[in-house]
Amino acid sequence: MTKGTLEIHSENILPIIKKWLYSDRDIFVRELVSNACDAIQKFKILADQGQASPSLEDFKVSVSIDKEAKKIVFSDNGIGMDAEEVQKYIAQIAFSGAEDFVQKYQSKNEKDQFIGHFGLGFYSAYMVADKVEIQTRSYKENSKPAFWSCDGSTEYTLEEGTKETRGTEISLYINKESEEFLEPSRLKEILKRYCLIRYFKCLC
């Protein structure tokens, strides 16, 4: 198991994001589904170019609720990641936009400047979650699965995962203030607004 620190210099990044985007908390749904769709599209391109074995299964993205565990799970069978890629794209790059936000827009009043200038992406999950976990496995042959976990601080853990198939599963452990998103009707409303309702699955 590897323990590390997110490569950011402002430890107050997540509290600032939460403050600025509080009224837009549901944007995490759009961002994470979009990321999942992108992962599938990337795999399709690699397969078309002969750089990946064609998929023998239908491509799918799903959003599910587990009310008992108080979590929302976003899953896809796209390109996936290995441990090195998780380290690069999640522990480093995903939070760089947030740091830029702190440096450039902390004293400004228009949150739309942030939304328009930087993709909220992965770290928007911390608008509603106390902890985020990732189980992922790369499309690459003989690749080992990876498991990443972070509670919203600058510390995270990265170790070998348990995922047996290609793709990524992101679990958001919803905080007390955001339990409204554990209601199927609420999540359905958000997905409908972003024309993503076909991805919904309830494990209530």
Residue ranges and their predicted role:
Residues 194-204:
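Low-complexity basic/metal-binding stretches
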